[in-house]
């Protein structure tokens, strides 16, 4: 069965590449749709046949001396599920792009870039070697730069694209460390060879953590993710849901068997994910840009995924949350884009309100997506977040970090309720200049399909993506209902936050809100203060040490000054006094004569 899956999946990728260069913009979207349908049917057959083995398809690409560079594909449950989710979500985003980018003269090129983005991610997920993973890794990085800077006339878009490249370059150093260590130690880049090792050097695992932190925007390398929403909404929807940002989490999932054998690295990843999910949730509470709130929610959920990979030792649950998160996060960005598009590009939620009457279908989908993000029972987010909270509660790593995860979960509900209150609820706070027409099939169709998925996908995926090793535990009712309880607490916090932000005084006068609104002052420190210090030091060194310092005195000014002194002495000697000249000649002659007599 897996042989058929591998052949047909690779065939579908080849067909998508062919249609990628078609001049008809809808042809590629149709190829993605049918490829997704085919992979979904194959996944259903695979699950019913109860096959759990893996398939490796390998071809020798280049042979250098005694080393062969292989192109190899790894088809397991992770690969099969992600193919279905990625193709399905991307198809809906492509259809939404036909509505959102309808006035863009380069819409054909835009859709091709989205397709290449997807293909690079599928190549990364199906990779069986570090070399092939590097190709997909760099592919999603390059395409993210091209798509975020799509509106190249906007300085903010270009700055955001450069941030994405620079921060991901830091993460790429970790991937290069992995490649070099693997080649020197093993002479092989395959995952199978790494899994077979009895001991893996900590240096290699630090590279894994650095690479994942850069690509999945963990704390310290996170500023590029909120800034990436400067690109078109379809780009944000695809980037935040099922492509680039989950690549780092997927890397941790692939190497989780090795990470879980190193307690120090496991604890490091656990704290990194915990601090990321809490910090991002706190920052989302005080943001007023609709897309930025959704972007920070992505960073918070990525931190939760990283936490469960290492802290709970359950990579299956992290992957389950990746799949569930893809459905409702893509829908949230598309709903936000629909609102912003209808409000003449207004993104400030304080100027919205009453959108449930102007755009009822989009508002309902936005509510479903927010509820799924909060983890409301029986939606997709509940089936992934509730097991995560349960398994983190029973882990024996660190109770302090577990408490922070619960606080972050309550904050998720808080900023989601706040966003719903300001945008969909209440009365309109601005005049809608253009009616929000919901009769476009390319607007409503993708939203409805993703809304259905956000409702029923959890029931489908939970059965075959549950942890393989389940401990027989009897949890008290308080821990069992912890996820639902913190969600309710977050809803209550949201009302206080709404009232707090209705005050007349400036947000910057409230230290707590200033910290949240300014993203912990991290962009101010990293993008302004530190570069300014280094530039001032460079200017001081160049102007005071180099140009006007010892080099100036030793070379240009020094040589000129010495020559001037010599010239002045020569000038002073030319006094035009004949008696002086005769006296000097007599003295010099007498001196020379005396020396000759002595010798």
From Swiss-Prot:
PANTHER family, per database record: NADH-UBIQUINONE OXIDOREDUCTASE CHAIN 5
Full protein name: NADH-ubiquinone oxidoreductase chain 5
Gene Ontology molecular-function annotations: NADH dehydrogenase (ubiquinone) activity
Keywords: Electron transport, Membrane, Mitochondrion, Mitochondrion inner membrane, NAD, Respiratory chain, Translocase, Transmembrane, Transmembrane helix, Transport, Ubiquinone
Catalysed reactions listed for this entry: a ubiquinone + NADH + 5 H(+)(in) = a ubiquinol + NAD(+) + 4 H(+)(out)
Subcellular localization(s) per the UniProt record: Mitochondrion inner membrane
Function: Core subunit of the mitochondrial membrane respiratory chain NADH dehydrogenase (Complex I) that is believed to belong to the minimal assembly required for catalysis. Complex I functions in the transfer of electrons from NADH to the respiratory chain. The immediate electron acceptor for the enzyme is believed to be ubiquinone.
Entry keyword Translocase: yes
Keyword Transport: yes
Transmembrane segments: 1-21, 28-48, 81-101, 115-135, 171-191, 193-213, 233-253, 265-285, 302-322, 323-343, 363-383, 398-420, 455-475, 481-501, 510-530, 577-597
Top-level enzyme category: translocase
Similarity section: Belongs to the complex I subunit 5 family.
EC number: 7.1.1.2
Annotated membrane topology: Multi-pass membrane protein
GO cellular component: mitochondrial inner membrane; respiratory chain complex I
Source organism superkingdom: Eukaryota
Gene Ontology process terms (BP): ATP synthesis coupled electron transport; electron transport coupled proton transport
Main location, first listed in the record: mitochondrion
């Amino acid at each position: 069965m897996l042989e058929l899956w591998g052949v047909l999946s690779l065939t579908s990728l080849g067909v998508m590449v062919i249609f990628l260069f078609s001049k008809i913009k809808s042809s590629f979207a149709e190829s993605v749709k049918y490829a997704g349908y085919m992979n979904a049917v194959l996944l259903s057959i695979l699950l019913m046949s109860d096959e759990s083995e893996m398939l490796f398809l390998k071809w020798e690409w280049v042979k250098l001396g005694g080393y062969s560079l292989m192109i190899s594909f790894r088809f397991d449950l992770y690969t099969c599920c992600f193919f279905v989710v990625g193709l399905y979500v991307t198809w809906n985003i492509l259809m939404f792009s036909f509505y959102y980018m309808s006035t863009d003269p380069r819409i054909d090129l835009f859709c091709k870039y989205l397709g290449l983005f997807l293909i690079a991610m599928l190549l990364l997920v199906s990779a069986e070697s570090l070399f092939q993973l590097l190709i997909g890794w760099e592919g999603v990085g390059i395409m993210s730069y091209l798509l975020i800077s799509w509106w190249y006339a906007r300085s903010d878009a270009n700055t955001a694209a450069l941030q994405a490249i620079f921060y991901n370059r830091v993460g790429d150093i970790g991937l290069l460390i992995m490649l070099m260590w693997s080649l020197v130690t093993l002479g092989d880049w395959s995952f199978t060879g790494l899994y077979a090792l009895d001991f893996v050097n900590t240096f290699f695992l630090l590279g894994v953590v650095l690479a994942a932190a850069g690509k999945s925007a963990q704390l310290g390398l996170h500023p590029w993710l909120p800034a990436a929403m400067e690109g078109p909404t379809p780009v944000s929807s695809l980037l935040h849901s099922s492509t680039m940002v989950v690549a780092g989490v997927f890397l941790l999932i692939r190497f989780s068997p090795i990470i879980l054998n190193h307690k120090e690295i496991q604890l490091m990843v656990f704290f990194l994910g915990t601090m990321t999910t809490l910090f991002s949730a706190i920052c989302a509470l005080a943001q007023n840009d609709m897309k930025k709130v959704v972007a920070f929610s992505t960073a918070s959920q990525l931190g939760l995924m990283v936490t469960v990979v290492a802290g709970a030792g359950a990579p299956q649950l992290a992957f389950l949350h990746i799949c569930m998160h893809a459905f409702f996060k893509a829908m949230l960005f598309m709903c936000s884009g629909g609102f912003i598009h209808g409000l003449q590009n207004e993104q400030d939620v304080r100027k919205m309100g009453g959108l449930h009457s102007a755009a009822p279908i989009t508002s309902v989908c936005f509510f479903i997506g927010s509820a799924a993000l909060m983890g409301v029972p029986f939606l997709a987010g509940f089936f992934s977040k509730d097991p995560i909270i349960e398994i983190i509660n029973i882990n024996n790593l660190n109770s302090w970090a577990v408490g922070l995860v619960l606080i972050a979960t309550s904050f998720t509900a808080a900023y989601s309720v706040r966003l719903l209150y300001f945008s969909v609820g209440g009365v309109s706070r601005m005049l809608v200049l253009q009616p929000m027409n919901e009769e476009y099939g390319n607007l409503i169709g993708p939203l409805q399909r993703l809304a259905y998925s956000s409702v029923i996908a959890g029931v489908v995926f939970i059965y075959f993506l549950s942890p393989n090793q389940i401990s027989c535990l009897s949890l008290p009712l308080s821990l069992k209902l912890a996820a639902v309880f913190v969600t309710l607490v977050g809803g209550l916090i949201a009302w206080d936050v709404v009232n707090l932000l209705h005050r007349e005084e400036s947000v910057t006068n409230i230290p707590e809100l200033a910290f949240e609104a300014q993203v912990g002052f991290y962009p101010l420190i990293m993008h302004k203060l530190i570069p300014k210090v280094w530039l001032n030091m460079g200017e001081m060194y160049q102007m005071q040490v180099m140009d006007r310092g010892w080099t100036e005195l030793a070379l240009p000014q020094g040589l000129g000054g010495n020559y001037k002194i010599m010239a002045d002495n020569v000038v002073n000697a030319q006094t035009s006094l004949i008696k002086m000249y005769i006296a000097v000649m007599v003295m010099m002659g007498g001196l020379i004569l005396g020396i000759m007599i002595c010798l």
